Amino acid sequence: MDWILKVEELAKHFRLHTQGGIRIPVFEALNLELCPGESAAVCGPSGAGKSSLLRLVYGNYRIGAGAIRVRHRDRVVNLAEASSDEILDLRRWTVGYVSQFLRVIPRVPALDIVMEPLRQRGGDPAEARRRAESLLDQLRIPERLWSLSPTTFSGGEQQRINIARGFAAFYPLMLLDEPTASLDPVNRRTVLDLISAARQQGAAILSIFHDAGDRRATTSRTIDLAMAPEAAEQPFRYEGRSASQAADRVP
């Protein structure tokens, strides 16, 4: 099967200009491939570069060396060479991202935030609204809050708005940075089922989970950034159960 994401000899470092120009290496010569329907979890200790990898794939960070290639519609885009317009088009149609924290313009209603990815694609406004309302209902956001800005919501409510926005449209490649971290068990199972459904539709998923049960319930292999590149990928069995069933059986 052809890959949707291919990372080749990727290197990244940060330079702290306020600290005398100290160079902080993140990773060197990182390689990975992800195919449609696959789900890989990025693992490693704090500071290993897990979130940085997702931000690099999303185009938030500049690539130090190597390549990040994404199959985008009828061509392959290398993020190391992509223009700003190409990156924006990738985000609109191919690469979805659920970050750790919700970042939105104040005063924009929660319903409009969830609808926005579908609006950007020029779809039917009524269908976009139905999809957004369905996700908000699934994620147990009370209807009385839909017309309010989520900047006033609790942390868990904000994360559910973030997840609803991330899953409103279908993306061939999804990046999930701790999507269940601040959720109660019931909403966590709902999110795991959304991830499972996206995989069944053919989405490739690159994720970060600190909860081992959630990780096993939704992923087929791990990428350990703390290990040598040749030993980075560690498989574990994916039994094809629904995500909530799998989560219930993981210690």
For the regions a language model picked out, list residue spans one by one.
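ABC ATPase C-loop
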Residues: 166-167
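Helix-to-loop junction immediately C-terminal to a conserved catalytic motif
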Residues: 58
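Conserved structural motif at the start of ABC-family nucleotide-binding domains
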Residues: 5, 27-29, 90
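Catalytic Walker B motif of ABC-type/P-loop ATPase nucleotide-binding domains
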Residues: 174-177
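ABC ATPase NBD coupling module
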Residues: 75-96
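Q-loop/switch helix immediately C-terminal to the Walker
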Residues: 101, 108-119
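Conserved ABC ATPase signature
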Residues: 149-153, 157
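Conserved ABC ATPase "signature" region
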Residues: 126-144
